[in-house]
Amino acid sequence: MSIIIPANSAVGGGYAVDNSCRFNNASDDSLTRSLGASETSLKKGTLSFWIKRAEAVGTAMWIYSNEVDNDNNRAYIEIDANANLRVLNSQGGANPVYFITDAEYRDFGAWSHFVIAIDTTQGTESNRVKIYNNGVQITSFSQATYPSVNTDLKLFEGGQTNKNHIGNIHGQSGKLSAYLSEFVYIDGTQNAATDFGEFDSDSGIWKPIDVSGLTFGNNGVYLDFEDSSALGADVSGNSNNFTVNNLTSIDQTTDTPTNNFATLNPLYKQDGVFSEGNLAYTISASDFDSALS
């Protein structure tokens, strides 16, 4: 059963995603906001996003981060230098939430969907953190640290200024080189993957569904990237807008989870440099390198 959307394809019927946002590490692209102090919950929340990577394996890519005061009190989601998904919540010198997947996410030609759903009030430890990829719960980890029951998490804590990021982490290198689409943060609820997607009845491909009717909570956000003049615009109804850093209208794309475009493949290269979401390949005047899609 296919559970990713391969290159040069579209998912027929149902909900259509019109836009994505292209992040380029070389341009220091990111989105930033000040997370509000009136959280719906410090114990429950969900992040959901579709991603199509553009950075070659060997470079860490920060997807989402929230820093409360310093390196000892922050949380982040990244695809690390080994292409594993990593979820960390660090506070007070400890890591009450720390997960590294065994699976490696190296595909440059396909869109992939992730859901990180947390509820520390759950009595069963394994129910407190659930991570899904393309509709399937991940159960194989090289690192799996579950929070104690009723733990308040820095991942959900607000009140800080300009330290809630998409595509970056405060004061660190390794910004995101990827396309992002349908980015959702739910404040106060542990959602299932089926709140964000479904398997196509004909192809079996995991595809997005309309999320506009979800309850987002006080600090919740939904970025659909449909306004090229305001790529950080929140359409959840909360107006929890992000500030755009170095992104411009040309970084809005129509390469989406329901309309996947072919891009150049950075796994096949010589001395050239890929950029702009693997749409550009730069070589020196003396080189005769080529690139493949």
Where are the model-predicted features located?
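Low-complexity, glycine/proline/serine-rich flexible segments
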Residues: 1-43, 84-87, 91-95, 159-165, ...
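Extracellular glycan-interaction surfaces
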Residues: 2-25, 48-57, 76-151
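Beta-strand-rich, repetitive solenoid scaffolds
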Residues: 5-7, 22-24, 63-67, 75-80, ...
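Extracellular glycan-interaction patches encoded by glycine-rich segments
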Residues: 152-180
